[in-house]
Amino acid sequence: MVETVNTLRREAFSKLNAVRNIKKNQIEGYFSERFGDIQVLSGNRHVVQALEAINRAFVTEGGSGQTGWTQAVAEFGPWLEQYGKEYGYYDLFLISRNGDVVYTVAKEKDLGENLIKGSLATSGLGRMFNKALTTSVLVFILHSRLLREI
């Protein structure tokens, strides 16, 4: 009887370990794909041009919603929106080196905020942005409920 229980226990732990390894591989694969997405986006000439044009208008006009900003968003926004839809992202951000959120696909209240000295400086997004400024390592930001916990 004891031997049967021990055998069943070993089999159960073996199955649990197998499931754990499968899940681990799935999670690692998911994050590997997301890092690949980031590398493609960050090196994409279109994204670089979008950030430059939208940021230039944002700085020149003192924020979002003005004519130059709207024109830049009309030019580059559809491509960014399509990219987000294709890859299942809820939102994509363009953030200047100064910490200004100059564009978001979702255009929520974080648009126009500053991640260094604004109300979002202590948010998960603000902390991750500040961490990205101080490291040469690629920082991956999850925009989700988990972000609020970081």
PLM region spans:
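Juxtamembrane extracytoplasmic/periplasmic/luminal helical "stalk" adjacent to the first N-terminal
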Residues: 1-74, 81-90, 97, 138-140
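Extracytoplasmic/periplasmic ligand-binding sensor regions of membrane-associated signaling proteins
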Residues: 74-150
